[in-house]
A protein has these predicted regions:
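A conserved regulatory-domain signal marking ACT and ACT-like small-molecule sensing domains
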Residues: 1-343
Length: 343
């Protein structure tokens, strides 16, 4: 990547509560959780859920004013599962077009802010990070190192242009709702590998370098989320790359992160949908998870952020999953993408 890469822009949603939970029991926990939030009309502008060793970990965001209500519902429904709570903001950079070098540069920027816990989700249109409120201003300024954003030459230029837009942004978050959610289309691809990497915040810069190395091979990143870890100070990244006989992904990770715990799942498929919705929008994720459950699809990971939903599951289940999605969403087109290599 060039010293400074031109992107479309970035957005920040402030005044949010970031909640992280882990449920070691119950493979239907994400569906039960999403159903609970939807029944109470609690919007989730950011949600990731990932499975590992039969335990589900979720990162989610609610409006700051809904924090107490959300926590009360969680405790009442699921008991004492010790949710972690942070006041923060969602930073979304777009478009990154599934390019690992964009993810790598963002990891590098955020990793240099110190040993911080950060939640990530990507889609074909954007990569989003949930940050603690104490580092959001520093993170915003640091973006202008590796990236250029249209007419905004400096952080001050960008901040001036954002005045008065925060309320409009919040109105879009929770005002749009339909009986059958519409999306612009569904894309999917198989022949993917799902990698699980456990690392701490201090290793984010090195993980960024790993993604830049993936980019040098011309690889396309079709799925990426983070999930919380039971180990203090650690987190888990889950991401998909094309299946490859010549590229040893685990070896590339271990070269820079020898202490990182890495697991690979082969023969998975990823899907993505873009639409006019924002985040969960009062139940989109709930409807999707119920449909996938009825189709007996073994979801491995999911994200719902900004205008996109992405997910990953075993390749052999992708067709039944697509049928389930078409049953609960208005999907005008379904497109299979072949595993891509940019070189």
């Amino acid at each position: 990547m060039d010293a400074s890469t031109r992107l479309g822009g970035f957005k920040i949603l402030n005044e949010v509560a970031w909640i992280s939970v882990i449920q070691p029991k119950g493979h239907k926990f994400p569906m039960a959780f999403a159903n609970l939030m939807a029944s109470e009309k609690l919007n989730l502008p950011f949600l990731t859920c990932g499975e590992q060793n039969r335990a589900w970990g979720l990162h989610l965001v609610v409006d700051a004013q809904d924090e107490k209500r959300a926590l009360g519902l969680i405790e009442k429904e699921f008991g004492d599962i010790n949710p972690a709570i942070t006041r923060g903001a969602i930073l979304s950079v777009f478009p990154h077009r599934s390019r690992p070098e964009i993810v790598g540069a963002l990891f590098d920027v955020l990793g240099k802010l110190g040993d911080q816990q950060i939640a990530f989700a990507n889609s074909p249109s954007a990569i989003s990070a949930v940050l603690g409120k104490d580092i959001i201003n520093e993170a915003t300024s640091a973006l202008f190192g590796p990236f250029r954003f249209g007419p905004y030459r400096t952080p001050a230029d960008w901040k001036l242009a954002q005045k008065g837009k925060e309320e409009l942004y919040k109105e879009v978050v929770a005002s749009y709702q339909e009986k059958k959610p519409k999306v612009y289309g569904l894309e999917w691809q198989d022949k993917q590998e799902l990698l699980h990497v456990k690392l701490d915040g201090a290793n984010l810069v090195n993980m960024g370098t790993v993604f830049k190395n993936f980019a040098r091979l011309g690889l396309v990143l079709t799925f990426l989320i983070s999930r919380p870890s039971k180990e203090k100070g650690k987190g888990n990244l889950l991401f998909c790359l094309p299946e490859s006989e010549k590229n040893n992904y685990t070896g590339m990770i271990k070269k820079l992160l020898p202490e990182a715990s890495t697991v690979e799942d082969s023969s998975v498929a990823s899907f993505s949908m873009n639409g006019p919705h924002f985040g969960d929008r009062y139940g989109i994720t709930s409807e999707l998870l119920m449909a996938l459950d009825q189709a007996c699809a073994d979801l491995l990971g999911l994200s719902c952020s900004i205008h996109s939903i992405t997910g990953v599951l075993p390749s052999k289940q992708i067709h039944s999953a697509i049928e389930a999605i078409q049953g609960c969403f208005d999907v005008p087109s379904v497109i299979k993408r072949e595993p891509q290599n940019l070189l």
